[in-house]
Amino acid sequence: MTTQLEQAWELAKQRFAAVGIDVEEALRQLDRLPVSMHCWQGDDVSGFENPEGSLTGGIQATGNYPGKARNASELRADLEQAMRLIPGPKRLNLHAIYLESDTPVSRDQIKPEHFKNWVEWAKANQLGLDFNPSCFSHPLSADGFTLSHADDSIRQFWIDHCKASRRVSAYFGEQLGTPSVMNIWIPDGMKDITVDRLAPRQRLLAALDEVISEKLNPAHHIDAVESKLFGIGAESYTVGSNEFYMGYATSRQTALCLDAGHFHPTEVISDKISAAMLYVPQLLLHVSRPVRWDSDHVVLLDDETQAIASEIVRHDLFDRVHIGLDFFDASINRIAAWVIGTRNMKKALLRALLEPTAELRKLEAAGDYTARLALLEEQKSLPWQAVWEMYCQRHDTPAGSEWLESVRAYEKEILSRRG
């Protein structure tokens, strides 16, 4: 341990103790909050089903930084490199298109065996896995509809894909001893003025009911549904709106997914967490950074990321909120993108754990809003960085920007050799 780091840590302990915070307890609590890293940052959402195919569904990965993963082995190696630079508990979030098979597999026929390598890798790296059906980048989603499709056979294909995905998810949970959160997001919508907004939603409602009809062990699998305001090519109407999925999750008691980029730019999901928690059993969060639209920029340690973390901690939602990330930037080093975004999420959680929430609640209840604002602002200047650096030290990860040196070395030795 460096003398400088140790001295900063001791001073930080004293400073936080003065406001009633036990920093050791904060670090213990931080180790209770895994962050689920998304595999698709590593290859720009290409997957292994048809890596040369185009990305559809109203989403875009922009940029052409060299060295993206071309197969599962490369993606896992890149993930390992990123995870070595991120302290504390982690999970991995997979999409169905990241299956491994020597022969083509129709999406409605995916099975646990197509993901056994991921499970073995997760066991070796002490990770939980989460899952997603992939209802995009496919000939049967080309017209913009999947689970709400008017064609019975096409709709059934996507229903069967989601049902098969649930079994894969349950397999993850059973094998790894931690439930897999499986999130359903569909791109269904229309570009222009829509006359019949009801019928597609009726079809989606019935389709989802069929998807979740098979009872699975909640210790292995958790269903989640995700809304969106609009996508490219679906600007005027989205079948799976916020109101639709809030109603669905409430009435069916599934988890609700809130994506930071899936709402109007003036809305924030941090304000939605406490409201949703009154009605749904669990929340899945997709922490992202929308720049003017759902652009999925790398997560920053900004006001909204901090507000999301604070909501989780202030209301003791550790066991009801699942923290996932969802961004994909192809314009920068993809491993660095993972490291920056995931470390920022964990920093936000630590800062929330170092807040004297009980004292702030008392001030708020007493109507002393002056003191509340004053203390909230003074809190920002307390030496949380020293606590973060100690946390990194204890988890054998770089405390500061030294991690970038490791990324650069990996880029030179590994990424630069990829075609």
Curated annotation (Swiss-Prot):
Q: What induces it?
A: Induced by L-rhamnose via the RhaR-RhaS regulatory cascade. Binding of the cAMP receptor protein (CRP) is required for full expression. Also induced by L-lyxose.
Q: In which pathway does it act?
A: Carbohydrate degradation; L-rhamnose degradation; glycerone phosphate from L-rhamnose: step 1/3
What biological function has been recorded for the protein in this entry? Answer: Catalyzes the interconversion of L-rhamnose and L-rhamnulose. Can also catalyze the isomerization of L-lyxose to L-xylulose.
Tell me if Manganese is a UniProt keyword of this record. yes
A Gene Ontology biological process term = protein homotetramerization
Which residues are noted in the entry as L-rhamnose-binding? 95, 226-228, 262, 326
As for family, the record states: Belongs to the rhamnose isomerase family.
Cofactor(s) the record lists:
Mn(2+)
Indicate the quaternary assembly.
Homotetramer.
Return the EC number: 5.3.1.14
Mention any additional remark: In the crystal structure, RhaA appears to bind a zinc ion at a structural site. However, the metal ion may be different in vivo.
Q: How does activity depend on pH?
A: Optimum pH is 7.6.
Q: Which gene is annotated as encoding this protein in its UniProt record?
A: rhaA
| Protein's UniProt name | L-rhamnose isomerase
Q: Record-annotated residues binding Zn(2+)?
A: 226, 259, 286, 326
Superkingdom assignment? Bacteria
Per UniProt, Mn(2+) binds at 262, 294, 296
Subcellular location as annotated: Cytoplasm
Catalysed reactions, as listed in the record: L-rhamnopyranose = L-rhamnulose; L-lyxopyranose = L-xylulose
Give the Gene Ontology MF terms in alphabetical order.
Answer: identical protein binding; L-rhamnose isomerase activity; manganese ion binding; rhamnose binding; zinc ion binding
